[in-house]
Amino acid sequence: MYGYEFYVDPSRCIGCQSCVKACEECDTHRGQSMINFDFIDRSETIGTAAYVCWHCDEPTCAQVCPADAIKKGEDGVVMSALKPRCIACSNCVLACPFGIPKIVPEYEQMMKCDMCYDRTSVGKRPMCATVCPSQALSYVRPEEIAHRREKPTNVFYFGEQKITTQVYMMTPPGTEAVVVDITEFMWEKTNA
């Protein structure tokens, strides 16, 4: 669906996991959910967030694949590893700064969100965005998002590495990029 963009707004996730169930039903996923669903421990409450593949402009997963099994289409969608090329080496899993790809042992293959390519390529919305009741995951025209207080960004910094993506994250007004301090994150994990 050209002219449409994918938006993720973690602040709107209500934890219903409708996206997870809908993703399992997508024809190309063989009953596997490609949604990364996370519980976030906040100081006073537990939050939830659903994440899809961010479809990087320069996908690290594809760059590190020794079998050249991960392809990016002209529309920017980064596809799951192609069988029989995928050797399930996990290089892509380890390299992705977002932690999105997963090796599915029963298929010996890397699988990840492909933005429901079987649907979006024929003008339909991805399954997860179709069922999300709170619009934490949405696939809409940019003008439909423009009225919201939050602003979309598709620029992420992981330390010194700048990553631009096809999927946008809704952020507070004035945020130009999402900066992830990896050293602070690792310090918290090792000293918890």
Model-derived regions, located:
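Non-ligating segments of multi-cofactor redox enzymes
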Residues: 1-192
